[in-house]
Amino acid sequence: MIDDRIARHNTRVLAAAQALGGAASPIVTSLGGIIGLALSPDRGLATLPVSLVQLGVALGTLPAAFVMRRLGRRNGYILGALLGVAGGLVAAAGVARGSFLAFCLGTLTTGLYIAYVQSYRFAATDAASVGFRARAISWVMCGGLAAAIIGPQTVIWTRELVPGLMFTGTFLAQAALALLTIVVVAFLRPAPFAAGAPRSGGRPLLVIVWQPGFAIAVAAGIVSFGLMSFLMTAAPDAMVECGHSVGSAALGIQWHVLGMFGPSFLTGRLIERYGKERVTAAGLVLIAAAGPRRVRREWRGFKERDDRSSGGRVRPAPGKCR
């Protein structure tokens, strides 16, 4: 019988790391489009900085896995957090210098960092028994609830931290949070099998890819994550365009991320009782149910804006985009 003491310790460490490292995503999402609109040479490129975060996650996921396989979880996560520090500093420099290119480079690097953060929940299962794995994932995901508050509140409280350089302090704070993450992940303990028990190399990647379950999981991830990103990327910029404050836009992202991680208190036990396939299907049904209502509301809002303008940049009065 597997002793879950190390797994429980690592789960607590990873939940704290999720709270700190996970704050990077709502920070960039809250401000990326707004800053992009101010710095970009073309209005159509306004949301590129946020899109580059998602690209960084996609590009960094497999390399992060290879790094951790070679260096171990603790060293790999320290390296990932260093990317987070670099991303925050480069983004801050881009904002301070008014450089759209530098800001985009910073958000891309932040995406590489988030690729490591997103694997925290899976690392929690390394030394866990079969019965504890689902709950370990849920506990780490609960750290995302704290991240949902830390990220947007960092935006609100640090956006004017550097006099005369709006939002520069926010990305410096993002770098500081990544530094704190390094301190936290340093407390990770190696899983028992790492002490000397030989391990097989696992199945070849092509064998895994050709499994029907893999295709279903990828399809579900593409649909759910794609629609979530579609909403999050443009929402803060749209709110500011409709007359809301930057703080309100950050709070909008806060509630969105709380909605993402709030069910973590229940999903572990739901998966144990009903199975991961049924829980995934229920999530997709919720997305499908929410979609038509959101499309109708946004279409009315954008149509009203088009009717009020002749192609120029017009900022509607507060509440007119509803």
Q: Could you say what each language-model-derived stretch is?
A:
Residues 1-8, 189-219:
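Juxtamembrane intracellular "pre-TM" segments in multi-pass secondary transporters
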Residues 82-97, 286-298:
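C-terminal ends and interior cores of transmembrane alpha-helices
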Residues 151, 155-157, 175-196:
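C-terminal membrane-cytosol helix-exit motif in multi-pass small-molecule transporters
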Residues 19, 100-115, 302-317:
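Hydrophobic core of transmembrane alpha-helices in multi-pass small-molecule transporters
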Residues 271-320:
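C-terminal transmembrane helical hairpin of 12-TM major facilitator-type secondary transporters
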Residues 4-37, 108, 210-230, 308:
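Pair of pore-lining "gating" transmembrane helices in MFS-fold secondary transporters
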Residues 60-73, 159, 262-276:
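Helix-to-loop junctions at the C-terminal end of transmembrane segments
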Residues 104-142:
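Cytoplasmic helix-loop-helix junction between adjacent transmembrane helices
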